[in-house]
């Protein structure tokens, strides 16, 4: 079955944090809406919501490089191996002031990762990086390899990681320069007390 870019974009909204929270509460209304919208009710008759979500994920994986798919590939197959350890603490959608980082990793050195797919605009990136520098030692952006030239001269202090069209292969093109001038007040504001204690006890004592 062929899907338009609008349909794929619509499917990708199923994997946002807010939607996952709704599933955990037993609310699957958004899935029902999409099944009806794209005449998929009969095709999925007898299937569980979980099976539909798995099938949808595979469709997105092959056809639509959205952030959810990239995060899974990046986390599961690359990040800890290349830039962390098995004991690294990783947080998804980590809020810093008005910005929300795609991924944050703590393992003695704090690192933040901002994903920019081929569908994303860069107009917010400058402000995001400014916020990230307040509490992270290293800032990385993850971009499609076809857009490397566009981002390569963006900021020489940030690291650049590229991924291919299949969202499978990641490569460090430029390592981030270490930032030691952190803002302790901002750090205390953005971390929940429990998270802060766990991180400091595990990595900074």
Say what each PLM segment does:
Residues 1-65:
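Interdomain/boundary linker segments immediately adjacent to catalytic/signaling cores
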Residues 54-62, 78, 179-182, 198:
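Eukaryotic low-complexity, intrinsically disordered regulatory segments enriched in serine, proline
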Residues 62, 69-107:
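Active-site metal-binding core of divalent-cation-utilizing nuclease and nuclease-like domains
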Residues 89-92, 115-121:
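Short, flexible loop segments at the rims of nucleotide/cofactor-binding pockets, characterized by
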Residues 103-105, 109-119:
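Conserved catalytic cores of phosphodiester-cleaving nucleases, focusing on short active-site segments
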Residues 107-109, 164-167:
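Short acidic-glycine loop/turn motifs at beta-strand connectors
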Residues 119-164:
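Catalytic cores of nucleic-acid endonucleases
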Residues 168-205:
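A conserved mid-domain beta-alpha-beta active-site/ligand-binding segment of alpha/beta enzyme cores
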